[in-house]
From Swiss-Prot:
It holds the Pfam family TGT. Pathway: tRNA modification; tRNA-queuosine biosynthesis. This is Queuine tRNA-ribosyltransferase. It is an enzyme of class 2 (transferase). It catalyses: 7-aminomethyl-7-carbaguanine + guanosine(34) in tRNA = 7-aminomethyl-7-carbaguanosine(34) in tRNA + guanine. Its cofactor is Zn(2+). Gene3D superfamilies: Queuine tRNA-ribosyltransferase-like (3.20.20.105). It comes from Pectobacterium atrosepticum (strain SCRI 1043 / ATCC BAA-672) (Erwinia carotovora subsp. atroseptica). The gene is tgt.
Length: 381
């Protein structure tokens, strides 16, 4: 993988990730394909929304169908018939979400298989081996996702363990002679001094890109923005920056304003299945009765298959009848909305008009613009 930074507007960056399997224009949003599928979508449909890279889930694919089934097909790309780049998370977030059925040690994490109750062990080395078998174009290190809230002492211990695991991930990745990209994950909760130690430690080890982890886990938005403003300038300029598990459209806008290049989240697909649809002027709750006889399209500014062919009344009808097609059409639209948003951000950065884009975006959705730190305002001016 090669990252090319093309231009900037304030802290925001316009670039591209170059893989053997294709080019990803950044800032980029990655749809989530947890079990080797973006729920309800064929790979061709996902591609038509504008997505250039997907996220796969190491933990879930390890449990089902398992490494051996994957290798029978070649790798994850062949298994799911997606031939663009794939980023896989390390499994750390899912393991630490298991709560009482897992035990963290220096060596790794012991836990009960949530499917059948079997005792399983996942370590940095094992995560690297699984992701190698998946053929991931971007491999994520195995880390401890620090919960929120966490006091300073706990966050420090967690961050330091993640750094030790980062070294082990790097070592095993290199031993496997994996030629793809390996990203480090910056931890430290909401504490700037701990984030400083994490960034420096990871940069000293050396990675192909750097993710900001441990955000979007319940902390106030102001803390997320503060940490991004503090951390992003410390990441080497020639390496991509990835904000994990984020988020709402406004979170993507704010991440881009602060220098983030990559995002992923289940929100567009999960919300689509629940009838919450993102449009230029905010959110449409399609199951509300007011849409029962609305013959207009979902979003007159959208060029997706759903908006070109179906009315709000039809989408409302499908939702009320729990028809599978409704979830599919909703998902097509939400994914396209996210890709259109990212394309708009990229164009605004290219033209040096990002703040005008931001003003228009917030006016349309009827929300105030979150302030940038003073040094970021100076950069954008």
């Amino acid at each position: 993988m090669k990252y090319e930074l093309q231009t900037t507007d304030g802290r925001a960056r316009r670039g591209r990730l170059i893989f053997e399997r294709g080019v990803v224009e950044t800032p980029a949003f990655m749809p989530v394909g947890t079990y080797g599928t973006v729920k309800g979508m064929t790979p061709e449909e996902v591609k038509e929304t504008g997505a250039q890279i997907l996220l796969g889930n190491t933990f879930h694919l390890w449990l089902r169908p398992g490494q051996e089934i994957m290798k029978l097909h070649g790798d994850l790309h062949d298994f799911m018939n997606w031939h663009g780049p794939i980023l896989t998370d390390s499994g750390g977030f899912q393991v630490f979400s298991l709560g009482d059925i897992r035990k963290i040690t220096e060596q790794g994490v012991h836990f009960r298989n949530p499917i059948n109750g079997d005792s399983i062990f996942l370590s940095p080395e094992k995560s690297m081996e699984i992701q190698n078998d998946l053929g991931s174009d971007i491999v994520m290190i195995f880390d401890e996702c620090t919960p929120y809230p966490a006091d300073w002492d706990y966050a420090k211990r967690s961050m330091e363990m993640s750094l030790r695991w980062a070294k082990r991930s790097r070592q095993r990745f290199d031993e496997l002679e994996n030629k793809n990209a390996l990203f480090g994950i910056i931890q430290g909760s909401v504490y700037e001094d701990l984030r400083d130690v994490s960034v420096k430690g990871l940069v000293d080890i050396g990675f192909d890109g750097y993710a900001v982890g441990g955000l979007a886990v319940g902390e106030p938005k102001e803390d997320m923005h503060r940490i991004l403003e503090h951390v992003c300038p410390q990441i080497p300029e020639d390496k991509p920056r990835y904000l994990m598990g984020v988020g709402k459209p406004e979170d993507l806008v704010e991440g881009v304003r602060r220098g983030v290049d990559m995002f992923d989240c289940v929100m567009p697909t999960r919300n689509a299945r629940n009838g919450h649809l993102f449009v230029t002027d905010g959110v449409v709750k399609i199951r509300n009765a007011k849409h029962k006889d609305d013959v207009s399209s979902l979003d007159e500014h959208c060029d997706c298959y759903t908006c070109r062919n179906y009315s709000r009344a039809y989408l409302h009808h499908l939702d009320r009848c729990n028809e599978i097609l409704g979830a599919r059409l909703n998902t097509i639209h939400n994914l396209r909305y996210y890709q259109r948003l990212m394309a708009g951000l990229r164009q605004a950065i290219e033209e040096g008009k990002l703040e005008l884009f931001v003003v228009d975006f917030y006016q349309r959705i009827g929300k105030p613009i979150p302030p940038l730190a003073e040094k970021d305002v100076a950069a954008s001016n």
